[in-house]
């Protein structure tokens, strides 16, 4: 069963300012929580295009959302191909788009997917299980310098060098096959006082490897720019991020697209062609309420940003 607690459900979907006859995109179907709530607000003329790379998520949605068959289009694809996939369905512009960039709970909780540091499983971490690159390849074949770089850049891990060195020493003797082996190496590399604070010691390295395996930051950057491009005037984009790298990327893109360019001082009216493309709906990110956090601890790091297309 594909069970998953949706984060910031109403805030994200209501923030899109749903029009019953509109066309919307859920770039991250997952457990279909956002999609279900959105579909409930659409008329028979409304449409939702939902993306996922995960076969289990798509099969689950086919069953649970069967009553919306006429309004729902399910797409098995990475959302970096957003614009291309919409064109394949004859869609050139939409009224709203949402991204929920968290790994879905079933992916985390299914040990054999290799995402979790709580279960011993083969090193995998692929969102799309037909993709070539796995966590096992990253851990065993990437150079020491590349491991240091991704642990520091994507995991913001202070002990990147020590962990990469420990991995390098271990894999010279025999390949690192499982998440459990990797967790033990990380624990050995981090000084004891640091292990006792800041959550699970493997959290940051696992995040870094997952981002590298799935090329998450590059994919998100490409998809967000495409999303802004295909929005109709007045259309909105809602983005939920779970770590500072994605949030920073979203914040900077929204800021850049909602800021005026350098103009000569004293212009009485800003020429239309210089008006910014976006208007910020959220100046500061929306975070989960106390009530939601009591029900779903995974919402703790979630941040929601919303912007509207001006023209």
Curated annotation (Swiss-Prot):
Its main location: cytoplasm. One of its GO terms (cellular component) is cytoplasm. Pfam families: Methyltransf_5. Its EC number is 2.1.1.199. GO terms for biological process: rRNA base methylation. It catalyses: cytidine(1402) in 16S rRNA + S-adenosyl-L-methionine = N(4)-methylcytidine(1402) in 16S rRNA + S-adenosyl-L-homocysteine + H(+). Residues 300-311 have a biased composition (Basic residues). GO terms for molecular function: rRNA (cytosine-N4-)-methyltransferase activity. S-adenosyl-L-methionine binds at residues 32-34, 52, 79, 100, 107. It is an enzyme of class 2 (transferase). Residues 289-311 are annotated as: Disordered. Residues 289-298 have a biased composition (Basic and acidic residues). It comes from the Bacteria. It is found in: Cytoplasm. Keywords: Cytoplasm, Methyltransferase, rRNA processing, S-adenosyl-L-methionine, Transferase. Specifically methylates the N4 position of cytidine in position 1402 (C1402) of 16S rRNA. Belongs to the methyltransferase superfamily. RsmH family. This is Ribosomal RNA small subunit methyltransferase H. It comes from Bacillus velezensis (strain DSM 23117 / BGSC 10A6 / LMG 26770 / FZB42). The gene is rsmH.
